[in-house]
Amino acid sequence: MAIILPELPYAYDALEPYIDAETMHLHHDKHHQTYVNNANAALEKHPEIGEDLEALLADVESIPADIRQALINNGGGHLNHALFWELMTPEKTAPSAELAAAIDATFGSFEEFQAAFTAAATTRFGSGWAWLVVNKEGKLEVTSTANQDTPISEGKKPILGLDVWEHAYYVKYRNVRPDYIKAFFSVINWNKVDELYAAAK
């Protein structure tokens, strides 16, 4: 059973005006599909390792050397994007009281968390992701990864992620990444973040 491209949980234009429909079509139907195709091609070379990408990427040294980088790139790309779509919604949501308290305790305030996350997304050189994760100590942490690397490979559990590859924003925002990052905060699905936080603690 091969990895398949998940359907978007909303219409392509549902996140307008923050994320445009053209970008969503290209990002989901083309870019994410390519990661799925390439991950499947890599896995087909070693059927004995199975298809549990989370388990494989949590222990990258266990991945056969000839497909390791392909799975880091494309398996990571699939996992990151499958999560990313679920982390956005056209509905207005807010962090639960428990998550809000954890954010305040870790960062000082929601505004300081937003500033830290924005800085991680803005300063990630080239392509990559900004993340809010639950680290090995069970604490919240803002971090970023290069390319399609996943925090799972560092023993961290991602609960919020933002794709800062240019393909994620260039159609609408051109080279102004900070405007895209600001817009993302208008479409975050805090209900999903809460769910992931509860499961990760």
Swiss-Prot record:
Effect caused by changing residue 42 to V: In strain: NEM1278
Pfam families: Sod_Fe_C, Sod_Fe_N
InterPro entries, alphabetized: Mn/Fe_SOD (IPR001189), Mn/Fe_SOD_BS (IPR019833), Mn/Fe_SOD_C (IPR019832), Mn/Fe_SOD_N (IPR019831), Mn/Fe_SOD_N_sf (IPR036324), SOD_C_sf (IPR036314)
Keyword flag Manganese: yes
Keywords: Manganese, Metal-binding, Oxidoreductase
Effect of residue 143 to I: In strain: 1510
Top class in the EC scheme: oxidoreductase
Catalytic activity field: 2 superoxide + 2 H(+) = H2O2 + O2
Coiled coil regions in record: none
EC nos: 1.15.1.1
Source superkingdom: Bacteria
Family: Belongs to the iron/manganese superoxide dismutase family.
Assembly mode: Homodimer.
Summary of the function given for this chain in its UniProt record: Destroys superoxide anion radicals which are normally produced within the cells and which are toxic to biological systems. May play a critical role against oxidative stress, affecting both the survival and the virulence of S.pneumoniae.
Protein name: Superoxide dismutase [Mn]
Organism (species): Streptococcus pneumoniae serotype 4 (strain ATCC BAA-334 / TIGR4)
